[in-house]
Amino acid sequence: FPTEESTLKEHQTDVVIACFGMGESFDGEAGLANFKTDLKAFVASHKGKQYNGESEVRLILVSPIAYEDLGELTPKVASRNRDLKRYTQAMKTVAAREKIPFVDLYEPSKALMAISESNPLTTNGIHLSGYGYWAVSRILYDRFIENVPGNKKWQLTIDAKAKKGEGDGLSVSKISSSRRAISFQVTEESSPSLAPPTDRELPAALAQRRDSMTVKNLQPGKY
């Protein structure tokens, strides 16, 4: 790893996704000015560079998640989240001035953490759990891919009696059914999503993004 620039050129980098703010936020309000200065310098160091030899590298800034309240394990939750919110806002301001994309993970993660009976997103308030990685990856995917054609969740409906089906995000054909089996063929029109690593009920904001399949008018029996 000789230098950052030489490594990015070696990899012919097209996009740099830069996550800042969690560690820096421990400097509190007093560290905000330096944080903004350093962030502007980081952006300036990459702007205009053609690491792939053809096009200017694209920068995306990503904020930290919120600090999760896990009881005695996570003291000073209110003050930590005040600082994290300040640093998230600072990143948003710099991104707007530099005209580069910005993804706010603080607000959506805080909203998920506030839901009672929800799965914990972190193991210690900061580091994501397996479920947390799944949930945050959904947020990132939606922000990165929003408004792109084909960015649809899979919704498949099969009418076993009529042998008809319809889909969103995929197309369905060759439907057949009997007392023991139902079969059909699907063609992907968008990417499938990974199942959550939990059997517990998901918050509505995440549940509505799940792929789903509904089979109607299925005769009783084992299939």
Locate each region found by the language model:
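Conserved SGNH/GDSL esterase-like catalytic core that processes O-acyl groups on lipids
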Residues: 1-45, 51-58, 63-76, 163-178, ...
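Surface-exposed alpha-helical segments enriched in charged/polar residues
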Residues: 9, 44, 48, 89-96, ...
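Generic, low-specificity signal for short hydrophobic/alpha-helical stretches with a mild N-terminal bias
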Residues: 73, 77, 84, 118-122, ...
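Extracellular serine-dependent O-acyl
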Residues: 55-65, 81-119, 134-158, 221
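Soluble non-cytosolic domains of exported or imported proteins
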Residues: 2, 29-37, 78-86, 126-135
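Long, contiguous hydrophobic alpha-helical segments, chiefly transmembrane helices and signal peptides
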Residues: 17-18, 22, 46, 62-65, ...
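Conserved catalytic region of serine esterases and O-acyltransferases that act on ester linkages
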Residues: 97, 119-223
